[in-house]
Structures are given as structure tokens and as C-alpha cells.
Amino acid sequence: MEKFMLGRKIGMTQVFDEDGLLIPVTVIEAGPITVVQKKKPETDGYNSVRVAFGDVQEKRLNKPEKGLFAKLGIAPKKYIREFRVDDPDKYELKQEIKVEEMFQPGDRVDVTGISKGKGFAGVIKRFGNRRGKETHGSMYHRRVGSMGANTNPARVFKGKKLPGHMGVERVTVQNLDVVKVDAERNLMLVKGAVPGAKGGLLMIKDTVKARK
């Protein structure tokens, strides 16, 4: 069975394992999520389910979203995301899925979120380029470096790493261990850091590349 969940990043803390070793963890408010649509090959060309998460005032929704929730007869939700599944018929419309139904301690997950915005950044911060010499007479400290050849090709190649906006990108961190699942409070503790700021939306899925 596929494992997936939507959540909200709360922050980081630390816990101790049975051997007394300290483990840095991210606390995630995970679910519950509600199934709002099923997609099948006959109608959409592929199998998936769309799920909703997070309470929101109805006035914050657009007309298609209002219509979707009104048709289902459920409270409006802030986020709607789609997950690929093998068989959508295993899920029912308006079905509520809780975190303990999907994940247990010891599972490994991939967590996707939107990274923190860093504003306009140079190539050293943005891409980790080496800096230039700080010696007397050097005018090259934090600059870009070579921009290409001269007369030919007479242009800067596409993909050249240059200063620009950093962050606010979709980032996935793979193979994180699930340390604890708190069913009563809908909390999930994941070892290590996950993308995004506090309160940011996270997509949590069963890992696709298991560690050897």
C-alpha cells in the first residue's frame, strides 16, 4: 500500500533513543487528510487520489474549490494535493486518513516542501563557488568568474551560475527516519531537518530510494 500524508512543519527539537543517544528531530503536524477526488485511467489517464488538509475560512477559497467542498459536503480545507496510487478504489471519497494509518516508527520517508527564501544572493552563497584570492592587488574576491570565451561564441551559455534569487524552490529530502508517531495529537517526529519555514506545507511519502 502506498504511504502518503500532508503536514505542517512545527519546528525542531531533540529526543533520546533507548541507548541514550540524542537524535535531532523535526516535529510535523501530520494530517488528518480527507480524500476529495479519485482519478482513474478511463477518465484522467492515470491513477491518483487528491487529498485536502488544514482548516480555512470559506472566503479564502476560489469558486472551483468552494464548489468541490460543497459538492462533497465537507468543511473547506486550505491545501489540496495529489498523490499517485496503484488502485484509487481502495480509497473512498470523504474518507479521513490519519497519520498512524500510514506511518509507524522505523519507516523511512521522503519529505517535500518549499525552501526558505534567501533573497538576492551571489554565487558563493547560492551555489557554493570558491572565492578568489584575498592577496594584495587581487580584484577578484566574490565575483562570478569566467563568463565564457571571447569573439566566439560571443555569448554567455545557458545555465551559467550567476547571482540571483535564492530559495522558494520545491525541495525534497530523502530517506528520513520516522522516530515517533503521536496519534492523539497528530504529530510525527522525523530524524533530521526538512525543507521550509515553520508552518510550511510538507508532502510526506514512502521513500523511493531505500538505503542499503
Swiss-Prot record:
Gene3D superfamilies: 3.30.160.810, Translation factors. InterPro entries: Ribosomal_uL3, Ribosomal_uL3_bac/org-type, Ribosomal_uL3_CS, Transl_B-barrel_sf. Belongs to the universal ribosomal protein uL3 family. One of the primary rRNA binding proteins, it binds directly near the 3'-end of the 23S rRNA, where it nucleates assembly of the 50S subunit. Part of the 50S ribosomal subunit. Forms a cluster with proteins L14 and L19. PANTHER family: 50S RIBOSOMAL PROTEIN L3 (PTHR11229), LARGE RIBOSOMAL SUBUNIT PROTEIN UL3C (PTHR11229:SF16). This is Large ribosomal subunit protein uL3. It comes from Acetivibrio thermocellus (strain ATCC 27405 / DSM 1237 / JCM 9322 / NBRC 103400 / NCIMB 10682 / NRRL B-4536 / VPI 7372). The lineage of its organism: Bacteria, Bacillati, Bacillota, Clostridia, Eubacteriales.
